[in-house]
Amino acid sequence: MTIEQILETIENMKVLELNELVKAAEEKFGVSASAAVVVGAAAGGAVEEEQTEFDVILDNAGSSKINVIKAVREITGLGLKEAKGVVDEAPKAIKEAISKEDAEAIKAKLEEAGASVTLK
């Protein structure tokens, strides 16, 4: 079979048949058909992708541990014992994979309560 014949056969296949062909090729050759992501450089510099999801990390409760526990309870919806456990285990993630706006609001609330917080 020539390359032209192979291409002609593929051209005449239905979408479901093409999907099965791709899956069979992936299994047979141990490869993935997902498209490679190519990132270009902008004006001689590397392109830096802006982070869209943030983790709010409680570094320590500071001197106002009770206020920080109350803030953690309010933010997470945890009970008193669970919130105290989170504060005692600092550094600990309070919220993960949230938007920048939400992360900054939570950080402000925890810092207002006396905690030391970082966003990652």
UniProtKB/Swiss-Prot annotation:
InterPro entries: Ribosomal_bL12 (IPR000206), Ribosomal_bL12_C (IPR013823), Ribosomal_bL12_C/ClpS-like (IPR014719), Ribosomal_bL12_oligo (IPR008932), Ribosomal_bL12_oligo_N_sf (IPR036235). The keyword Ribonucleoprotein applies. One of its GO terms (biological process) is translation. It comes from the Bacteria. GO terms for molecular function: mRNA binding; structural constituent of ribosome. The keyword ATP-binding does not apply. Keywords: Ribonucleoprotein, Ribosomal protein. GO terms for cellular component: cytosolic large ribosomal subunit. Forms part of the ribosomal stalk which helps the ribosome interact with GTP-bound translation factors. Is thus essential for accurate translation. HAMAP family: Ribosomal_bL12. Homodimer. Part of the ribosomal stalk of the 50S ribosomal subunit. Forms a multimeric L10(L12)X complex, where L10 forms an elongated spine to which 2 to 4 L12 dimers bind in a sequential fashion. Binds GTP-bound translation factors. Belongs to the bacterial ribosomal protein bL12 family. NCBIfam families: L12. This is Large ribosomal subunit protein bL12. The lineage of its organism: Bacteria, Bacillati, Bacillota, Clostridia, Peptostreptococcales. The gene is rplL.
